[in-house]
């Protein structure tokens, strides 16, 4: 528990360090104008930037039209401003935002999404749309259509939205998961009650804990492609109740391991999106690199069911799979003003490793619904369901592995700081399995007495992360 508390403090300490650095920078240097909404440097977005003057004479800037519309909406409408001006895409001159004409959904993404581009003259907007695509609209349509954020980011599933060329984010993540109930199919029981109910039961798992610290990186080399990397470090703990064959008493043994896990790499390609930037369809391809340790040491005794020596260390305690894995699937996202929906259908192939062990393949579907009351906050719920095939060791299917799990989580995003030409978010997720049907295997001991090989389930999981997002301004 002390280790968990110490690890949970890492994001908080990192956050305090970032705030201290930012305060120091403001004290030592002349402030550099940044977007009021997303934090991007204004001098890198001169071609698309907007200028907003409030009733009291104070002035703010945004990197482009999308963030301008969000700031107007957050302030309660145009009545909160003395003037709002945008840069004409053709001449570069500031023009009144209300009288400007806009092109939405073209092939050009100059700032944050959706990609509204302003023109002083309607005929020039129409000529641009004829060349680059998109829909020609006026200010009223743009204002009514804009959402507080260009997209939201789910936790356990993926988004179909790609944010635009040059978008970059890096984060630190702390995760914790605990399982504490014996599952035989869809029924759960306390581990102590399970082993005490059958004197022939030699052992039973009692509790598993997994802590994960990770560095995550996202980068978009093009407008339609987003790349992702996850570099994890695991701390795992597994408790087992074991019956002394001589005395019949039950004791508990604890196994621990920690180290680098398998590095995950993913790419999302957005092959279709609507002109209004409210519907998206993408394909996902991913792999893991076998950087985590897999202990292939085998039990010296032949397993009577498998008729071979099986891997001694449990699959749940292994840090890696000792082989590359492959994931593919489809993603779909849709927006309704302040609401975002994300869905995914993925399949992961786990090939056999060099120790003749293969984790079961996994089919997963997911659905997320997020609400964004303003551009700083997201609240949501996420549901994911997976079916995992049984693990195999030398071709023998491990009976107490695999099954069906459905998880429900509540999630949140809070953008708490604009700094360094971007913004920082504090992301959190807490959830639990709401349905499990886990595989078990009935067996008999040497005396012919029946017992059951089972898995752990139920429990809960949670994640906390700090993410910094920045976009390298495109050259238009």
Where are these regions (language model features)?
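Thiol/selenol-based redox catalytic cores and closely related redox-interacting motifs
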Residues: 80-146
